[in-house]
């Protein structure tokens, strides 16, 4: 893709640089020998791509061909947003949650043609009614934050599902590990419309 943003990170030193693909979809950069590199690509209205390579051979490398498969984002796509945290039984965003929401805000501001539902889910512990109310408040808290960052209100809707869409067997009365319950406590983005 022409004009895609590619971030190249030297995993040994932590140094990274950002490039834009040329008219043939390529980037050029100078790498160090005997290093591991990770790459991530970003292009509006597409899912991000990732890859890696290393230069741990003794010969000079003049060219490395890596291909990223970057699918168009389409209606119905669902993405889990990691690292969104709330205190127990609260709907106030914790400060460490803002980094992921800032990334989402940047994406939505870059893609004003996309309308999304931000949904919050709980585990099955507690009453269904309380979980539904709590999840709606948490979803709204995230949406309010995104609107404060400039995301148009018309492009995002909050929806709490409570314990209504569990991703595993951990319903009422089923013994589960904390990790299994955690899998159900999640925040997701669903694409409602792409113009």
Which stretches of residues belong to each language-model region?
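Periplasmic OmpA-like peptidoglycan-binding domain that tethers envelope proteins to the cell wall
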Residues: 119-195
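Periplasmic peptidoglycan-binding/tethering modules of Gram-negative envelope proteins
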Residues: 1-115, 178, 192-195
